[in-house]
Regions:
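Phosphate-binding site of ATP-dependent enzymes
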Residues: 152-260
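Short glycine-rich anion-binding loops that position phosphate/pyrophosphate groups of nucleotides
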Residues: 56-60, 141-142, 288
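Generic beta-strand structural signal
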Residues: 117, 194-195, 274
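Short, solvent-exposed loop/turn elements at beta->coil junctions and helix N-caps
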Residues: 39-40, 177-182, 271-273
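Conserved N-proximal alpha/beta basic substrate-recognition cap immediately N-terminal to
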Residues: 11-114
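Protein kinase-like catalytic core scaffold
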Residues: 135, 188, 200-201, 268, ...
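Active-site nucleotide/adenylate-binding loops and adjacent lid/helix of ATP-dependent enzymes
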Residues: 2, 7, 82, 89-188, ...
């Protein structure tokens, strides 16, 4: 059996189908490696010339939490055998760790949301003097807005976690984070997609009253399309709009590029917003980047074709 040129590690088939279609169109010889049910022999050679990791930290909300540690072990195995891995083990570890993401922003001298990590609500009593409410509760291993909630007091937080112990998943580390005051209906948030260290496109996401800002059509459909998101909304939400943002300021692109380079990602996205008091705050880092085809097309290209073209270059280099 011949070795394919490319192996794409994935867990969510709907998210990856547009990329698979783009690879098929280009005639790329690739293996779609579904890690939901998989095994590998530690004596086996690498299964492809290039490995592209597309695992999502939110796999656990779809009942696939076992895919994440398996994928991390697999990436380490590939790398130890000398494979060329895109968005490899160190990149994946960073995506799984929002504490590390915040620390990276801090170390780069960037503005970031005030954050406190905890594994027991009572431990927060020692930090009450520094707590500010309302605040956002989120898991250290996040994704797709899962397990997030706004809380207005320490007692409310305690009650919430007692009523819904699943909020401690996938690991027993939670974050209480500054609620960044902004206008979601007009200002919204900005997501910048990067490919091979360069900005692919920027888009503005407006009209969101919940936490799921995933740009996948499966999570936030367009028009009459039907989605199948596994992350239910805890509060009524309006339909978000994903708008091209070609006029993103040059100084933002410069700062974002600096942050992206520091992540070590090959492909990914950053999110920031402008607060009501004019702070520009980056708050999220994503290696598994769900592209929005309509945004790319509005700028004159299909973003999935761009990724497929990039992967072809990696294969031939």
């Amino acid at each position: 059996m011949s070795t394919p040129d490319l192996a794409v590690l994935y867990e969510h088939p709907t998210w990856q189908q547009p990329l698979f279609d783009a690879l098929d169109k280009r005639g790329v010889d690739y293996l779609a490696y579904d890690v939901k049910s998989a095994a590998f022999d530690l004596t086996e050679d690498v299964q492809a010339s290039i490995i592209f990791n597309q695992l999502s930290p939110s796999a656990y909300v779809r009942g696939n939490g076992h895919a994440v540690p398996f994928a991390l072990a697999l990436l380490n195995h590939f790398e130890s055998n000398g494979a060329r891995v895109l968005n490899g083990a160190s990149a994946f570890r960073l995506e799984l760790d929002k504490i590390a993401q915040i620390r990276l922003m801090r170390d780069l001298g960037m503005d970031y949301p005030w954050t406190i990590a905890f594994n027991n609500v009572e431990a927060l009593r020692d930090h009450e003097a520094t707590l500010n409410f309302p605040a956002i509760l989120k898991p250290n291993q996040g994704g797709s807005g899962a397990r997030m909630a706004e809380v207005n007091s320490l007692n409310e937080l305690k009650c919430l976690l007692e009523e819904d112990p699943s909020l401690w998943q996938p690991d027993p580390v939670l974050l209480l984070q500054e609620k960044l005051d902004h206008d979601p209906s007009k200002q919204g948030i900005v997501r910048l997609e990067f490919l091979d260290g360069e900005l692919l496109y920027a888009m503005r996401v407006v009209g969101v009253s919940g936490f799921n800002l995933c740009p996948s059509i499966d999570c936030n459909p367009e028009g009459d399309e039907e989605g199948g998101c596994a992350v239910p909304s805890a509060t009524p939400t309006s339909d978000p709009q994903f708008l091209p943002y070609p006029e993103v300021p040059a100084e933002v692109v410069e700062d974002a590029s600096r942050l992206f380079r520091a992540t070590g990602f090959d492909v990914g996205a950053l999110e920031y917003l402008i607060t009501s008091d004019e702070r520009r705050v980056f708050y999220d880092i994503n290696a598994n980047s769900n592209l929005r085809r309509s945004v790319g097309l509005a700028m004159g290209f299909d973003p999935f074709d761009k990724v497929a073209e990039y992967l072809e270059r990696q294969i031939s280099s």
